[in-house]
Each structure stands twice: as structure tokens, then as C-alpha cells.
Amino acid sequence: REVIDIRLPLWEPTDIKGIPYYNSKDNNMVWASPAELPVDPKSNAIVFLDELNSAAPAVQAAAYQLILNRRVGQYVLPKGVSIVAAGNRDSDKGVTYRMPAPLANRFVHVELRVDYDDWMSWATNHHIHPDVVGYCTFAKQDLYDFDPRGSSRSFATPRSWSFVSQLLSD
């Protein structure tokens, strides 16, 4: 399936609804929908709203109708398209805005945890440098050591280990 990656903090409210323009043929205003949203009625894409709770509150509010009603103004999301969103927890010390209750209520919330076996399977299939895999096998506790109460600006995560792998491979 096609994944349409939309980083909501980079969008404005008008980016969700689109831009109005005058339709001289019908003598009315219509909206030009965002090019990122699928228009093919047979589409089964996944619209991935990434960093949802890092988007400004006005952008989050503009997404209400798209998420709940699968439409924005005149634009209707094709029937086979799914909407998935992701964001950091407030406790992760990221740039986040509290998700408004009406928006939070439009989703099923699933909190993901780092799992060593899942990461090792992923790392093996994605050519993570053998030294990184070897170290993480030796020191499993170092795969993820983020402490939200801590003051360290650097910490180990699966993402940072993939960065180390890239550095070792270059």
C-alpha cells in the first residue's frame, strides 16, 4: 500500500482544507484540495499524519473533519484509504501540544514500546552494521535508555543506533 507521509507541524490549517479559487464556469468558489491527499476512488493508501500532536492547535483542529468524517469541505477521502497518526508522548520531552479531547476521541491510541527481539529482526533485515548488532546483542539494555526525568541531551534509541550504523558504514 502507498503511504502518504504528512508531517503536520509543517502544515498550516489552509493546507488541510486547500485553497479557494473562482470557478468561472459554474460561477462559484471551489477548493483546490491538497495534492498530497489521494483522489483515485480505488486508492487504498494510508494517510500517515506524523507528529500530530506537534502540530499547532489550529492545524490539529483543521484535521478534525478529515479524521472523523473522512472529508474536508468538498474533498472526500476514497473509501479504501486509511488514516493513521503518530506523535510523541508529552513525557518524551518533545515539542508537543496537548491533544484536544475532540481530536483524541477520534483515534484508538496504541503506545509502542521498544522490543529487543523485534528490533534485532528489523536490524538484520535492514543491513544494520554488524558492530551495532553485536554491541546491542552484548548490551541489550543499551538499545533504549531514554529517561524522561534525566537531563542528558543524548541517549540510545533504535533510531540513534541506525545513525551509528550509517556512520560505521560510510
Report the location of each language-model feature.
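AAA+ P-loop NTPase catalytic core and its hallmark functional loops
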Residues: 1-138
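Conserved AAA+ ATPase small/helical "lid" subdomain
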Residues: 120-170
